[in-house]
Curated annotation (Swiss-Prot):
Primary gene name: GARIN4
PANTHER family: GOLGI-ASSOCIATED RAB2 INTERACTOR PROTEIN 4, PTHR22574
Major localization listed first in the record, in broad terms: Golgi
Organism: Homo sapiens
Entry similarity comment: Belongs to the GARIN family.
Entry keyword Transcription regulation: no
Name of the protein: Golgi-associated RAB2 interactor protein 4
A single Gene Ontology CC term: sperm head
C-alpha cells in the first residue's frame, strides 16, 4: 500500500472502515482528501452514484442530459459509532484558470479539471433516508424543508452487484426497523428546540421545545424520524393529559352546575307539594282550633283544587263536631271548583248580588261560605247556648277572633261570655221569682199561663230560626229592620207567624207589666241587665267592619235578643226593650226565610 493512501487516523481500507463500508476510496473521498474541506480530509465515506428520478420512477433530464448525483455518507469523528453527515455532489464542468500576464511575458492557459462539485452537506439528523423501490434500487430522501428527492442507483461496471444491499444495510443502521427510535448520533436536549424539522412535523415543534427545556444534562438519542412520532405522541400525551385534566375538571363543573339545577328541580317539586300539604294540614289544624274561615281561605289560595277540597272537608269535620251543619259544609267542600261556586252561590242566596259576589273569585267565595258556615255551626237554641257558656266561649266568638284584630276579639269574647253568664243567672232568679208569684197569686194563673206560652213560642221560634240557618246558610242584610211591611213582601209564608208572635209578645208584655209590680228588686236587676246588653250590642254593631264579620255579629245579636225575650217574658219588665229588639228578631227570621 502506497504511503499516499495512509491516513493519520484511519482510512477506508482500515479495519473499522472496512468492516463498516467494505469498499475502497471513491472519487469523492479522493477529492476531499486533497484538503479542500479539512474536516473531511481523513473521514471515511461510503459513496455511490445515482441518477435523479421522479416519484413515478421517471428519469429527470435537464437539457437532454441525465442528472447524475454522487451521494456519500461520512463520519466526521472517529469517536462516533455511526455516520453523521450526508454529502451530495454532482459532476463538475470544465473551467480554465487564467494566470496573470505582464507586458513582457506570454499569456499562459492551464485547464484544471475537477471531477465532482460538492453541492450539499447535511447532517443526517435533518435527512430521512428510506427505500422507495427495492427491485428498481430506488431511494427516497426527505429533507427538513419538506422537499423530497428520489434517487436510483447507477453503479459502475466494476462495482459489486450487491451494492444496493449495502445501502439497505446502512439505512438499517441509521434507522433500525425494529428499533426505529434509535438515532445515529447523540442530540443534546438543549439543541432540539433550535433543530428544524420537516414540514409535516412542524405541528409538533411546540412539543419538541417543551421537551427540550428539560434538564440541560440530558442527552436525547432520538433520531429525526422519531422526532415526529415521539413529538406527536408527546403532544398527544400532553394534550391527553390536558384532556384528562379537563375531563376531571369538567365533571366537577358539570356536577356543580347540575347539582343546583337537579337539586332545584328535585327540591322545588317536593317542596311545592310539601308546602301545599303543609298548607292543607295547617288549614285543618287551624280549623280544629276554631279559625275555620281564615285557615281554609289560605288553603284555597295556596293549594291545588283537590287539596283545597280535602282540606275544607277535613277542617269542617274536625272543627264542627259532626252536626248537620258540618255535614252540609263537607258536602259542599268536596265538590269541584265550578260546582263549589254554584253550591256556595245557592247557599248564600238567590239574589243577583250574592251570586255575583260568589262568582268573582274563589278565595272570596270561600270566605263567604265559611262565614255562613260559622253562623250555621254556632246558631243554636238558648238551652244549648247555656250549656256551652259553662264550658267556655262559643265557637262564634272564636271565629270572630280570627276575623277581627286580637284586642277587639278578646274584648268581645269576654263581653259575650259575661253576658251569657249574667243571663243564665238572671233567668234562674226570674224563674224562681215566677214560681213563687205563681204560688201566691193563683188568680193570675191565666195570665201566667199565657206568658209561659209566649215564652215557649219565643223559644220555639228561636229554635226554628236556628234550623233555618243550618239549612239555608244565608247572609244577613236582605230587608229593612225598620219597616215590617217592606219585609212582608219578601218573607212570604213566614210573615204570619212572625207578626202573630210579635203581637202576642207585646200583649204579654203589657199583661206582665201590670201583674208583676210586686217584684221590684228582681225587675231592677233585669232592667240593668238589659241596659248592659243594649250597650254591648251598640258597641259591637258600631265597631263591626263590613264583610264576613257582620254575619257573626248578627248571630251574636240574635242570641242576646233571644235571651232578652226570655227574661222579659218571665220577669214582666222591659216592654220598651222588647219592642226595640223585636225588629232584630224579625230581621234574623227574614234572613233565615230566604
Amino acid at each position: 500500500m502506497n504511503a499516499d493512501f495512509l491516513l493519520p487516523y484511519y482510512t477506508a481500507q482500515s479495519g473499522s472502515s472496512m468492516s463498516m463500508f467494505n469498499t475502497t476510496m471513491g472519487k469523492l473521498q479522493r477529492q476531499l482528501y486533497k484538503g479542500e474541506y479539512d474536516i473531511f480530509k481523513y473521514a471515511p465515506i461510503f459513496e455511490s452514484d445515482f441518477i435523479q428520478i421522479t416519484k413515478r420512477g421517471e428519469v429527470i433530464d435537464v437539457h437532454n442530459r441525465v442528472r447524475m448525483v454522487t451521494m456519500g455518507i461520512a463520519r466526521t469523528s472517529p469517536i462516533l459509532p455511526l455516520p453523521d453527515v450526508m454529502l451530495l455532489a454532482r459532476p463538475a464542468t470544465g473551467c480554465e484558470e487564467y494566470a496573470g500576464h505582464g507586458q513582457a511575458t506570454k499569456r499562459k492557459k492551464r485547464k484544471a479539471a475537477k471531477n465532482l462539485e460538492l453541492t450539499r452537506l447535511l447532517p443526517l439528523r435533518f435527512v430521512r433516508i428510506s427505500v422507495q423501490d427495492h427491485e428498481k434500487q430506488q431511494l427516497r430522501l426527505k429533507f427538513a424543508t419538506g422537499r423530497s428527492c428520489y434517487l436510483q442507483l447507477c453503479p459502475a461496471l466494476d462495482t459489486r452487484d450487491d451494492l444496493f444491499a449495502y445501502w439497505e444495510k446502512l439505512i438499517y443502521l441509521l434507522r433500525p426497523p425494529m428499533e426505529s427510535n434509535s438515532s445515529t448520533c447523540g442530540i443534546p436536549a438543549e439543541d432540539m428546540m433550535w433543530m428544524p424539522v420537516f414540514q409535516e412535523d412542524r405541528r409538533s415543534l411546540g412539543a419538541v421545545n417543551l421537551q427540550g427545556k428539560g434538564d440541560q444534562d440530558q442527552v436525547s438519542i432520538q433520531s429525526l424520524h422519531m422526532v415526529s412520532e415521539v413529538c406527536g405522541a408527546t403532544s398527544a400525551a400532553y394534550a391527553g393529559g390536558e384532556g384528562l385534566q379537563n375531563d376531571f375538571n369538567k365533571p366537577t363543573n358539570v356536577l356543580n352546575a347540575s347539582i343546583p339545577k337537579t337539586s332545584t328541580e328535585l327540591a322545588e317539586e317536593p317542596a311545592t307539594g310539601g308546602i301545599k300539604e303543609a298548607a292543607a294540614a295547617g288549614a285543618a289544624a287551624g280549623a280544629a282550633t276554631g279559625t275555620v274561615a281564615g285557615a281554609l281561605s289560605v288553603a284555597a289560595a295556596n293549594s291545588a283544587p283537590g287539596q283545597v277540597s280535602a282540606a275544607i272537608a277535613g277542617a269542617a269535620t274536625i272543627g264542627a263536631g259532626g252536626n248537620k251543619g258540618n255535614m252540609a259544609l263537607a258536602g259542599t267542600a268536596s265538590m269541584a271548583p265550578n260546582s263549589t261556586k254554584v253550591a256556595v252561590a245557592g247557599a248564600a242566596g238567590k239574589s243577583s248580588e250574592h251570586v255575583s259576589s260568589a262568582s268573582m273569585s274563589l278565595s272570596r267565595e270561600g270566605s263567604v261560605s265559611l262565614a255562613i258556615a260559622g253562623v250555621v255551626l254556632t246558631s243554636r237554641t238558648a238551652a244549648e247556648a247555656d250549656m256551652d257558656a259553662a264550658a267556655g266561649p262559643p265557637v262564634s266568638t272564636r271565629q270572630s277572633k280570627s276575623s277581627l284584630s286580637g284586642q277587639h276579639g278578646r274584648e268581645r269574647t269576654q263581653a259575650s261570655a259575661e253576658g251569657c253568664k249574667e243571663g243564665r243567672e238572671r233567668r234562674e232568679k226570674d224563674r224562681a221569682l215566677g214560681r213563687s208569684s205563681h204560688r201566691r197569686r193563683t188568680g193570675e194563673s191565666r195570665h201566667k199561663t199565657r206568658g209561659d206560652k209566649i215564652a215557649q213560642k219565643s223559644s220555639s221560634r228561636s229554635s226554628f230560626s236556628h234550623r233555618a240557618n243550618r239549612d239555608d246558610k244565608k247572609e244577613k242584610g236582605c230587608g229593612n229592620p225598620g219597616s215590617s211591611r217592606h219585609r212582608d213582601s219578601h218573607k212570604g209564608v213566614s210573615h204570619t207567624p212572625i207578626s202573630k208572635e210579635s203581637r202576642t209578645s207585646h200583649k204579654s208584655g203589657r199583661s206582665l207589666w201590670t201583674t208583676s209590680s210586686g217584684s221590684s228588686k228582681g225587675l231592677g236587676r233585669v232592667s240593668s241587665f238589659l241596659r248592659n246588653v243594649r250597650a254591648n250590642l251598640t258597641t259591637k254593631v258600631v265597631g263591626t267592619p263590613h264583610g264576613r264579620d257582620v254575619n257573626v255579629m248578627a248571630k251574636m245579636a240574635e242570641r242576646s235578643t233571644n235571651v232578652a225575650i226570655a227574661e222579659t217574658a218571665e220577669g214582666g219588665q222591659g216592654l220598651e226593650t222588647v219592642g226595640s229588639m223585636t225588629p232584630d228578631i224579625m230581621e234574623t227570621v227574614t234572613f233565615e226565610a230566604h
